[in-house]
Amino acid sequence: DMLEEYTKQVAKYLDTLQDGYGIKAPVVLNLLPVDGKTWYCKLSKDDYISLYKKIQNLLDDEDVTNVVYSYSETYQPGKHLMERYPDNKIDVINVTYLQSKNAIDLPLYQKSIKEIVKQTLPFAQDHNNVFGLTTGVESIGDSSIFSETLLTVLKQHHIAYLMFGRNQGEPIEEHYYTPYPGVSNKKTHGFMEMINDEVCVFLEKLNGLYLEH
């Protein structure tokens, strides 16, 4: 069975994520993220949930103990979230909303972030899940998205984490979601305001949480 073999390989990899003392690293595992593009998104709701639970059971059979299961979904403006939520050993809900540099619409971005929180946060609380957000505007456009949109949301709501789209390629390609040295102040000042606010906790403030042996 191809699915069983694939799951065994995933289990073997997860087992390697440990330090020299054999302490395994915890992993938030986004099984079958719903992005509207992959093959399993074409499954019916019931078939999708059945597949999700089957993979969970297969990983349990392989004695995987260092994962926290997450349900992840990409937000599409106007669409309702959480319709495929598996409701089976889920601890984290992640919603992804990224704008590409060719379709930047800052008013829509702000409206969408508010709608995501409105839909997802009460749902997560009702199911005893933590809620995290993966987001960003490619090439940034205006750094007010950090200080005025995202920071405001972080201050008003209990959001467990905030992740941004990845930066990659040459700077001239503008495939970045967070500023880097050399970009204009227009794309930096809002980000600096956000990271310097006490509501945000970055790795440098987590001294002692994880130690390198």
For the regions a protein language model found, what residue spans apply to each?
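The substrate-binding groove and active-site-proximal loops of carbohydrate-active enzymes
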Residues: 1-5, 41-45, 98-110, 135-140
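Substrate-binding cleft of extracellular glycoside hydrolase catalytic domains
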Residues: 1-67
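Alpha-helical scaffolding within the catalytic cores
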Residues: 12, 73-85, 110-122, 144-151
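Acidic (Asp/Glu)-rich catalytic clusters
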Residues: 14-24, 82-88, 120-126, 152-158
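Aromatic-lined carbohydrate-recognition surfaces of secreted/lumenal glycan-active proteins
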Residues: 26-33, 52-79, 128-141, 164
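Extracytoplasmic/secreted cell-surface and envelope-processing proteins
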Residues: 37-41, 78-81, 102-105, 140-147, ...
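Aromatic- and acid-rich polysaccharide-binding/catalytic face
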Residues: 80-110, 165-167
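Substrate-binding cleft of secreted/luminal carbohydrate-active enzymes
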Residues: 129-213
